[in-house]
A protein has these predicted regions:
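Extreme N-terminal starter segment of soluble prokaryotic enzymes
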Residues: 2-6
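Glycine-rich phosphate-binding P-loop
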Residues: 8-22
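ATP-dependent small-molecule kinase phosphotransfer cores
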Residues: 36-87, 94, 127
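Small-molecule kinase domains that catalyze NTP-dependent phosphoryl transfer to phosphate-bearing small molecules
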Residues: 52, 66, 128-173
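Short, amphipathic alpha-helical "lid/cap" segments that border enzyme active or binding sites
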Residues: 76, 172-180
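Conserved phosphate-donor/acceptor-positioning beta-strand/loop module used by diverse small-molecule
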Residues: 101-124, 129-139
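C-terminal helical "lid" subdomain and adjoining coupling/linker elements of P-loop NTPases
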Residues: 187-190
Length: 190
């Protein structure tokens, strides 16, 4: 692909989004950017990982509110700079919002049936189904809260995306291949 592009991937917890994004980036021959983006920013603000987790959590304490906004703005700036330099896949980070007006962006949201997600989470983390359900609720709530706080939008609104894909019963490689084909068609069409 000659033209520069950006693929953003939002996802429900337990859909295999990280694996799908990793495989997609490999198929497209581009870099994947995800939560590791925060590492240099975390160091700059002299924050521990626990503090970053608190900032990103469902109910951050008042002390973190200003740091949280600064952290998000730094992260957004870094994501934009990286996307200006090269084609890439961005996992999470409210990418759909950051690149909402960018014609180079192909915005994807991955969802799946609850039982599929529960089984994946329980297997991956070696926990029972009840524990998996609680974790799914907690992570999805935290992601939705973060998204609404910084974008003013719900990540579940299909209008934010070019493609919303139910991955229930699909292998990550199949999903990544399908998204890659969509991206290639979009790029060639422009």
């Amino acid at each position: 692909m000659e033209k520069r592009f950006i693929v953003t991937i939002g996802r429900e917890f337990g859909t295999g989004g990280r694996k799908i994004a990793t495989e997609l980036a490999q198929m497209l021959g581009v870099q994947l950017y995800d939560r590791q983006l925060l590492e240099p920013i975390r160091e700059e603000y002299n924050l521990t990982q626990a503090q970053v987790d608190q900032i990103k959590s469902v109910k951050p304490s008042w002390w973190y509110e200003n740091v949280s906004q600064d952290l998000y703005e730094e992260e957004e700036k870094l994501v934009r700079e990286l996307a200006e330099k090269e084609s890439c896949v961005i996992l999470g980070r409210t990418g759909f919002h950051i690149f909402r007006d960018d014609e180079r962006a192909f915005k994807v949201f991955l969802m799946a049936e609850r039982a599929f997600r529960r089984d994946k989470v329980a297997l991956r983390l070696a926990i029972d189904e009840a524990g998996a359900d609680k974790l799914i609720d907690k992570v999805d709530e935290a992601r939705e809260n973060f998204t609404k706080t910084f974008s003013g939008k719900s990540r579940y609104d299909a209008r934010n995306y070019d493609l919303v894909l139910n991955v229930t019963g699909l292998e990550p490689t199949e999903v990544a291949r399908f998204i890659a084909e969509c991206v290639e068609r979009r790029i060639k069409g422009k």
